[in-house]
Amino acid sequence: DIKYSRIWQIAYPIILGSIAQNLINITDTAFLGRVGEIALGAGALGGLFYLAVIMLGLGFSTGAQIIIARRNGEGKPKEIGQIIDQSLYFILPMAILTFLLLRYWSVFILDFAVKSENIFIETSIYLKYRSYGIFFAMGNMVFRAFYVGLAKTKVITYTTLVLAIVNISLDYILIFGKFGAPEMG
């Protein structure tokens, strides 16, 4: 017997995590907007490009999440471990390929899509730095699938809140060059 309260217990941590993720996006926009139009445009364009690439991992992890939830419902925890192992084995080559795409091949796509030379240069630089995060992002997707599949979504809220705090702090430090860090704009 499923009740709305049980669904809410599972859903609200995911909702809070999504709010924290959007807070990161708003903060990125606010900080880059203070730097200038080119930085803001490069961040927005690079962010969309990154999002399009990361969707590959999200699609895969959603499939893993469904299978994990099924095995959890069937009471087969050992099989859940095998699913996680296989997911990590699959996601690593995917992360390597998407890293290469972001780091080295994105300039060819951007050259075709971006008219402004300044935005092209800044977006290329942004994606080169951002490309290193793909490994963490895709690994995180597997573990997110694990916790959602087990209906233990509060873990996602805590990790996303930590992510938001770290991201906003590093944005401030690195964009504006605070505490001795280089100003990266």
Model-derived regions, located:
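Short alpha-helical transmembrane segments in multi-pass integral membrane proteins
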Residues: 1-11, 68-135, 166, 179-184
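Residue-level signal for short hydrophobic patches within transmembrane helices
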Residues: 4-23, 27, 49-56, 132, ...
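Helix-loop interface residues and adjacent transmembrane-helix termini in multi-pass membrane transporters
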Residues: 11, 23-26, 34-37, 71-74, ...
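Residue-level recognition of transmembrane alpha-helices
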Residues: 11, 18, 44-47, 91, ...
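Hydrophobic/aromatic residues within transmembrane alpha-helices of membrane transport systems
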Residues: 16, 28-32, 43, 68-73, ...
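Interfacial/gating helices of multi-pass transporter permease domains
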Residues: 32-51, 117-122
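Small-residue-rich hydrophobic transmembrane alpha-helices
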Residues: 40-100, 137-156
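Cytoplasmic helix-loop-helix junction between adjacent transmembrane helices
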Residues: 115-116, 120-123, 127, 134-161
